[in-house]
Each structure stands twice: as structure tokens, then as C-alpha cells.
Swiss-Prot record:
Removes the phosphate from trehalose 6-phosphate to produce free trehalose. Trehalose accumulation in plant may improve abiotic stress tolerance. This is Probable trehalose-phosphate phosphatase 8. It catalyses: alpha,alpha-trehalose 6-phosphate + H2O = alpha,alpha-trehalose + phosphate. The lineage of its organism: Eukaryota, Viridiplantae, Streptophyta, Embryophyta, Tracheophyta. GO terms for biological process: trehalose biosynthetic process. Belongs to the trehalose phosphatase family. SUPFAM superfamilies: HAD-like (SSF56784). It holds the Pfam family Trehalose_PPase. The gene is TPP8.
Length: 500
């Protein structure tokens, strides 16, 4: 959970670039299951993988002095609660530079219009709360359900500093892509939880022996520091000092520095209450995002793709920079305080049921907007349709209208009544949708999405809207060859499709 490109003497400084909120053109439903791990390595994927490994050049490790390490530890790991002035600074930060992704969701939806969304998620601090014991950083069942729904419709990946095996056990979703060890261990989806995921890339494999040796040395060296914990993340090591008294930070930094003198192949970076030891190669979360996008067929020149990356730490800045360099994509920083970042938007963890409610609500809305936009577009198309009156008069709307209107005079009145009824039903459904969005227990489930039919919002060409008076509030959007049913419950949405 660190930024590989930031060396210790400069670790308190990062590039301050105001976030950009692209106003480009909602997104096509393209599930991760549609892009298998094997297909990633086909059609040029294997060649790209080989090229990536061949060009991961080692970089000289910079040995920071212990005083700089301690200053960096203090700078990025504040131990005092935020004052009112800090809160005011955060408000100004969100208003001027990095607006809330939830408050700006209309802009987010506009940026995703007509594009394929690819979702990248950090784990600690984003999907799970930050806890004292890293082995207890469990994500909530509600968050897991939201991520599962996202993965059903968009290619989705967990990009983390954790070991892949560890984060897979936490998340429990085999259909995701996983980039562990800060992107140095990338694996593709599997068909079930028992099956091993397919290894796609491990650019630091040759460093495994030295990492294991350094791990044993750090375990021995730091055992005299109460609260210190060394975690082996396979291709990197983490020295957690969250439970270490601040007075002991300097001795701990000296211990870590002493171990690294014997391993010039490794370098030291740091994140939130953790020191990271990683191979001295040019690889980070940003490179992992580039690899996954390339392997999925989304080259840099593809303008119909919108990568969305949500993370909370320095290490995620590498991914934010990649998205800004591409000129497309949304970086979203999860933070309770103002900080320099390359992210476009921000999310604050509100003190609600979940510590990570901000990310939970956002990924849920990411799905909900697909369906609400479909309804809105269908309504517009229906109103503009020349056949709208005929459809309203001739289609059984479960309101006792079995056939076409015969009397022109009474027909106008009946159509007016029907139109008002349609408006009332639509407003009631939108009110339910709003209640769903405001509920922290919102759940989304998709049943047989589109049966293989592309769910592109732009492809929905409705000639009529039929609103029933059924308790569940059924909306049927009549298209040329399919009928899409959207059922709205107080805390659940379901979209199904069947051929006409």
C-alpha cells in the first residue's frame, strides 16, 4: 500500500494535479465472464505478456536515512484527530479540486455514456476498513454482494499490496481478476472457488528467494519492537507499525534499514502505517492496470473504454497517474482528509453502518444508473414516437383496456387518463429508485441479463412504455425484437429479457 515511484526523502510530497471530470459520453453491460483469462492471453496477449516481462528493468535502490523514514512515517500516518480547521480544509478540497463521486454522479454517468466500463478496486481501506490486525480486515457481506454484481456486468479487478491468496480468501469471488503484491502477481478468474486462478503475469518472480530471506531477517530483527508485525505478501514485504508506540518508530526504522543493507535488490517505500519492501523494478499498480487493460483488448487508443479505479493509498496514485496519462478514466480517492492526488474524484467514509460505505454506495450506484438511464431513455423515445397513442390505446396495460379505442371523442379522454396514470406510475417508481439509492442495505441482482443481447443504453429503441399497476411496479420496454422487464422493489432491482 505504497507508491513505488516515491522514494523516502520525497515521500511526503506527491504531484498535485487537480482532478479532471471528463464530460465525454451510459455503459455497455459487458460482464467479466465474457472475457476469460485464456482469451486475455490469446490474440496477442501472450506476446504482450512476454514483452512486458522483457522490459521490466531493475532500477537502482535508493537507501533513505532513518530520520527521513521516520519523518515520512509521521507525515503519512497522522496520529491526532482532525480539527475543525482540517474539516474546513477537506470541504474546500472536495469543492474545488476533487468533488465527491457520489455528489457528482451525474457527471460520472455522463463520462461513461456509450463506453465500456472496467472497474479496478483497492482492498484495504476501500473494500474493507483499516484495522489494527491485517488478518482481520474483512469486507462486509453487503460490499461483497455489490462487488459481485459489478463483476457480472463489467470486467473487474482487485489491485492490492496484499498477497493474491490472502485477498482472494477475503473477497471470496473467483470471477474477479486479482493483481496482488502491488500488481506483481496478476491472476485471472476461475470457474469456481476450488479451482486455482490462472497466472497471467509475475514480473518479479526471480526476486522470490531474496524476498524470503529478507522476510526471515526482518522477523528476527523487529521482534524486539512491541507491536511491529512483518507480513509476507509473496513479492513484497510489509512492516506494519500501526500498533507501535510512536517513540519506537525511529528504532524500528533503523532495524528495517539495517536489514536492507544486505539486500540491494530491494527498495523501501511506505504507506498508511506500513513500510513496504519491494523489488527494485519499474512495476507498480499503474503498470498492472495498463497490463490488464491491454490484455483485455483495451489499447491506449480505444476511446470507447472508461477505466474506473477506486483506492485510498499512495500506491493507488500510480494507477491514478496512468488514467490521467491515457486521457480517459476516472480515479477516485477514498480519503477523510485533504491530500495531493492525481484522482479526479473523492469518496469519504461516512460514519454509518459500514466504515467503507462510500465505496459501497458508489459501486452500487454504478450499476443502478444503467437501469435508470434505460428507463429514462425509453420514456423519451416513447414520447417522441408517432405510435405512442396507438400503443397506449391498443396494448393491455392491466388497467382494463383490452382493445383499441373506437370513439375519437372518448378516446382522447381515455388517453389523457392513461397518460396521467403513466406519469403517476413513473413518479412512484422513480421515488422507489431514490429510496433504494439512499438505503445502505441496497442490493442489486441481475437475472439472466439480456440473454446475450448487448445491453448498450444507446441500443434501446423503444416505441412504447407500458406501465402496469402491479404491486411490484413492472415496467416493460417494447423494442423491435425483445421486451425488457425491470422490476423495482424497495431494496432490489432485477432486469430480465425475453425474446418476442
Amino acid at each position: 500500500m505504497t507508491n513505488q515511484d516515491v522514494v523516502m526523502p520525497d515521500i511526503a510530497a506527491a504531484a498535485a494535479m487537480p482532478g479532471s471530470s471528463g464530460r465525454a459520453p451510459l455503459f455497455a453491460c459487458r460482464g467479466a465472464a465474457a472475457v476469460s483469462a485464456s482469451s486475455m492471453l490469446g490474440g496477442g496477449g501472450a506476446a504482450y505478456q512476454a514483452a512486458v516481462v522483457a522490459h521490466v528493468a531493475p532500477v537502482p535502490a535508493i537507501r533513505p536515512c532513518a530520520s527521513w523514514v521516520v519523518e515520512a512515517m509521521r507525515a503519512s500516518s497522522p496520529t491526532r484527530p482532525a480539527a475543525a480547521a482540517v474539516d474546513a480544509e477537506y470541504d474546500a478540497w472536495t469543492q474545488r479540486k476533487h468533488p465527491s463521486a457520489l455528489g457528482s454522479f451525474e457527471q460520472v454517468a455522463a463520462a461513461a455514456s456509450g463506453k465500456r466500463v472496467v472497474v479496478f478496486l483497492d482492498y484495504d481501506g476501500t473494500l474493507s476498513p483499516i484495522v489494527a490486525d491485517p488478518d482481520m480486515a474483512f469486507m462486509s457481506d453487503e460490499m461483497r454482494a455489490a462487488v459481485r454484481d459489478v463483476a457480472e456486468h463489467f470486467p473487474a479487478a482487485i489491485v492490492t499490496g496484499r498477497c493474491v491468496d490472502k485477498v482472494q480468501s477475503f473477497v471470496g469471488l473467483p470471477e474477479l481478476y486479482y493483481a496482488g503484491s502491488h500488481g506483481m502477481d496478476i491472476k485471472g478468474p476461475s470457474s469456481n472457488e476450488e479451482e486455482d486462478t490462472k497466472i497471467l503475469l509475475q514480473p518479479a518472480r526471480e526476486f522470490l528467494p531474496v524476498i524470503n530471506k529478507a522476510y526471515k531477517a526482518l522477523m528476527e530483527k523487529t521482534k524486539s519492537t512491541p507491536g511491529a508485525r512483518v507480513e509476507n505478501n509473496k513479492f513484497c514485504l510489509s512492516v506494519h507499525f500501526r500498533c507501535v508506540d510512536e517513540k519506537r518508530w525511529n528504532p524500528l526504522a533503523e532495524q528495517v534499514k539495517a536489514v536492507l543493507r544486505d539486500y540491494p535488490e530491494l527498495k523501501l517505500t511506505q504507506g498508511r502505517k506500513v513500510l513496504e519492501i519491494r523489488p527494485s523494478i519499474m512495476w507498480d499498480k499503474g503498470k498492472a492496470v495498463e497490463f490488464l487493460l491491454k490484455s483485455l483488448g483495451f489499447d491506449d487508443d480505444r476511446r470507447d473504454v472508461l477505466p474506473v479505479y477506486i483506492g485510498d493509498d499512495r500506491t493507488d496514485e500510480d494507477a491514478f497517474k496512468v488514467l490521467r496519462k491515457r486521457g480517459q478514466g476516472l480515479g477516485i480517492l477514498v480519503s477523510k482528509c485533504a491530500k495531493e492526488t492525481d484522482a479526479s474524484y473523492s469518496l469519504q467514509d461516512p460514519a454509518e453502518k459500514y466504515t467503507n460505505a462510500g465505496a459501497h454506495v458508489f459501486v452500487t450506484m454504478l450499476l443502478t444508473v444503467v437501469f435508470t438511464a434505460a428507463v429514462a431513455l425509453a420514456l423519451v423515445n416513447a414520447v417522441n414516437s408517432h405510435d405512442f397513442a396507438a400503443h397506449l390505446a391498443g396494448v393491455d396495460c392491466r388497467m382494463g383496456l383490452a382493445g383499441p379505442v373506437r370513439c375519437p371523442a372518448s378516446g382522447f379522454v381515455e388517453l389523457l387518463v392513461l397518460a396521467l396514470h403513466v406519469v403517476r406510475c413513473v413518479l412512484a417508481i422513480l421515488d422507489r429508485l431514490h429510496a433504494c439509492l439512499m438505503s445502505p442495505s441496497l442490493q442489486l441482482s441481475i437475472a439472466s441479463p439480456c440473454h446475450g443481447v448487448p445491453c448498450s443504453i444507446g441500443a434501446v429503441e423503444a416505441s412504447a412504455i407500458i406501465v402496469s399497476d402491479a404491486p411490484e411496479g413492472l415496467i416493460s420496454t417494447l423494442t423491435t425484437d425483445h421486451i425488457y422487464y425491470m422490476t423495482v422493489f424497495p431494496a432490489k432491482l432485477a432486469l430480465t429479457s425475453e425474446e418476442v
